[in-house]
Amino acid sequence: MTVPSITGGVIDLMMEIPTGKAGMGMKQARALTKDAGTDKFSHHPAQYLFKDAGDRMSLAQNPDALVQMMDAHGVAAALVAVNPRKPEGALAMFEKYPTRFIGEVGVDPNAGMKSVRELEATIKLHPNIVAASAAPCLLNPQVPIDDRKFYPLYAKCCELDIPVNMLVGVPGPRVPYRCQHPGLLDEVAYFFPELKVVMRHGGDPWTDLCVKLLLKWPNLYYSTSAWAPKHYPRNILEFANKRGKDKVMFAGYFPGISYERIFGEMGDLPIREEIWQGFLHDNAVRVFGLEDILKNT
């Protein structure tokens, strides 16, 4: 089975490439972990899971080669990180390829109002910067999703009308998981009904809870980052096929996972034909407000 043709092309909601920060969270993981094994990892804080990601790091640092790779797999645009203190690399990508790359700003609630101001200032640097992102497990110290430290950032996202991509579930890096339990999103979604939150990295092993929360809260969404398609949770796919057709979006996680593997496995997913367009394109355009960016593609 092959993936149907997608009008407008595929939108990849997570390309984890270095655009002004240490690649793939290595620096943060080393500061938090206590096991000897992580110190030996060279390219990924969960290298025991993403063993060959290092083979693709040189490609990940070459925007021209990335666009060629995207073209080969029908990817119209990809979301990359923007470091608020070193945004130049990402800004150069947006200027050279204005319809191919979009950006998200990593936030650190431990920094208080400094992070709030950095978020707003960075969003205003370029129209292609469309979201915030957070990895609670890699913050130092860790900050639970529903902690009051996050609330000023959530409020700012509401003001700016941007979604926040949030890691949920047991993380690959050898750090504690409690701060990322998806159940913590319940109160956030309740207190901030205008805030669009996109769950990242699977929510495993609480994917049944993720589905319940997605069904309950209109402002919660789910993306498939950090999982190869053959490992996508089946209950998430069942939800996408039915009541969650507007809620589930594709995120690839290159270079952690190769495009060859992602799109080689994609066609075997039990997704109904009428769901593909939303999953791979339309939902991302709507949630992240990409209409103007993509109109010239």
Positions of PLM-derived features:
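Mid-to-C-terminal alpha-helical segments outside catalytic/metal-binding sites
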Residues: 1-13, 20-72, 77, 244-247, ...
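Hydrophobic faces of well-ordered beta-strands that scaffold small-molecule active sites
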Residues: 11-15, 78-80, 102-105, 130-134, ...
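Active-site environment of divalent metal-dependent phosphoester hydrolases
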Residues: 18-20, 85-88, 110-113, 139-140, ...
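Short, acidic/polar
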Residues: 57-69, 111-123, 207
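Active-site gating/metal-coordination segments in enzymes
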Residues: 76-77, 82-172, 176-179
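Distinct, well-ordered alpha-helical segments
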Residues: 88-95, 115-122, 143-147, 174-191, ...
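Active-site-adjacent C-terminal substructures of enzyme catalytic domains
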Residues: 196, 203-262, 268-274
